[in-house]
Structures are given as C-alpha cells and as structure tokens.
C-alpha cells in the first residue's frame, strides 16, 4: 500500500522531515516514489515551516495512497493557513 509519510532528515537536535510517497513496507528513511513537500518543526524567523505540493498530494490520494496520522494533521493545518491567507 502506498503511504504519504514523513522521512527524517536534518542533523543532531535540528530535525527536518520530507513528506514522501512510499510503499508502507519500506523503511522510514528508505527508498520512496516521490517527495511532495517538507516539514520543519523548529523553523525560526522567516524560515518556512511547512511546504506541500498540493497537486501531487491530491494525485497520490486519488490513486489510493493513504496518509499517516501526522501527515493528515499537517495537511489539515496547511489547508487552514491557506484558507486564512
């Protein structure tokens, strides 16, 4: 099953996550089909906290990909901020 989930990047005490489309059986940071955005939980100042390629996310959801719980929360947050702006 295809899953849209977070893959850990960044460095020590400075996490950074890529939103990736991958097979659910692959390792967290293993191979993936496509990167559709990123999430920076410790963004400061002018740094971007969340970036999502909505067109590609919608495509993958339309072909049956499932989101992880955290990614579902992030997409909901992204839609709220987009609607408010």
Curated annotation (Swiss-Prot):
GO cellular component: cytoplasm; small ribosomal subunit
Any GO molecular function: structural constituent of ribosome
InterPro entries: Ribosomal_bS16, Ribosomal_bS16_dom_sf
Domain of life (superkingdom): Bacteria
Pfam families: Ribosomal_S16
A single BP term in Gene Ontology: translation
Keyword entries, A-Z: Ribonucleoprotein, Ribosomal protein
HAMAP family membership: Ribosomal_bS16
Family listed: Belongs to the bacterial ribosomal protein bS16 family.
The protein's name in its UniProt record: Small ribosomal subunit protein bS16
Taxonomic path: Bacteria, Pseudomonadati, Pseudomonadota, Gammaproteobacteria, Pseudomonadales
């Amino acid at each position: 099953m295809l899953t849209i989930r977070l893959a850990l990047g960044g460095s020590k005490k400075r996490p950074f996550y890529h939103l990736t489309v991958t097979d659910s059986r692959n390792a967290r940071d293993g191979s993936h089909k496509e990167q559709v955005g990123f999430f920076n939980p410790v963004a400061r100042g002018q740094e971007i906290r969340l970036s999502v390629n909505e067109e590609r996310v919608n495509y993958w959801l339309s072909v049956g990909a499932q989101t992880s719980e955290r990614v579902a929360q992030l997409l909901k947050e992204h839609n709220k901020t987009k609607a408010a702006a």
